[in-house]
């Protein structure tokens, strides 16, 4: 559902599904997927990621632990719209364990639709747009200064976890070698 609605509403974007699949030989934790997301964002392989976990909170926290990643928790259409307009981050996390029966699926679709309804970073409310845009820029500057370089970060992690995330990245995006990514 996540891929279907992202593809439907992110009309001007190339949408790639690199999620976890039932037929994969390897299982990935949300922490490992967050590391993969950090690699994809920091290597400019993707500009934006829509992801999640059971609660959405764990993935949001894991993603925000990655240098260069600004992830918002967007359980509702209003949250998605406000994150896109005010915070202008590069990842959103949804609570995928919510009851995606008819009403849950409807909420998921409305959330994705609201996320991509306008270009990101326009500010909200519009009367406060200039201030909101400046605040989002300051937040990104503070985050960048408070974290280490992504390559240094990778070198401090468990090499097996990094290797596992790189393996998924290479397979998902048909990358040739490590020269294309950290």
Regions found by a protein language model. Name each.
Residues 81-181:
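C-terminal binding/interaction regions
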Residues 12-27:
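A short beta-strand-loop structural module common to alpha/beta enzyme folds
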Residues 30-48:
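Short, structured active-site "lid" loops
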Residues 58-71, 75-79:
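Short Gly/Thr/Asp-enriched flexible loops that form oxyanion-binding sites at enzyme active sites
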Residues 1-14:
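Glycine-rich phosphate/diphosphate-binding loop of Rossmann-like nucleotide-binding domains
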Residues 53-58, 99:
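Gly/Ser/Thr-rich loops at beta-strand to alpha-helix junctions
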Residues 46-52, 71:
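A short, small-residue-rich loop immediately preceding and capping a beta-strand
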Residues 20-21, 74-80, 96-99:
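Short, acidic/turn-prone active-site loops that include or flank metal/cofactor-
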């Amino acid at each position: 559902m996540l891929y279907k609605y992202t593809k439907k509403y992110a009309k001007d974007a190339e949408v790639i599904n690199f999620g976890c699949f039932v037929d994969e030989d390897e299982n990935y934790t949300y922490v490992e997927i967050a590391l993969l997301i950090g690699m994809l964002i920091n290597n400019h392989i993707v500009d934006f990621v829509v992801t999640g976990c059971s609660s959405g909170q764990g993935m949001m926290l894991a993603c925000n632990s990655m240098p260069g990643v600004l992830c918002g928790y967007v359980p509702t259409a209003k949250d998605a719209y406000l994150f896109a307009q005010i915070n202008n981050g590069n990842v959103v996390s949804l609570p995928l364990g919510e009851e995606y029966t008819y009403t849950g699926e409807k909420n998921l679709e409305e959330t994705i639709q609201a996320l991509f309804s306008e270009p990101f970073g326009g500010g909200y409310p519009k009367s406060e747009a200039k201030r909101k845009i400046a605040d989002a820029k300051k937040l990104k500057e503070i985050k960048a200064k408070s974290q280490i370089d992504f390559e240094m970060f990778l070198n401090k992690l468990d090499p097996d976890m990094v290797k596992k995330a790189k393996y998924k990245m290479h397979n998902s995006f048909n990358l040739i070698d490590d020269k294309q990514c950290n």
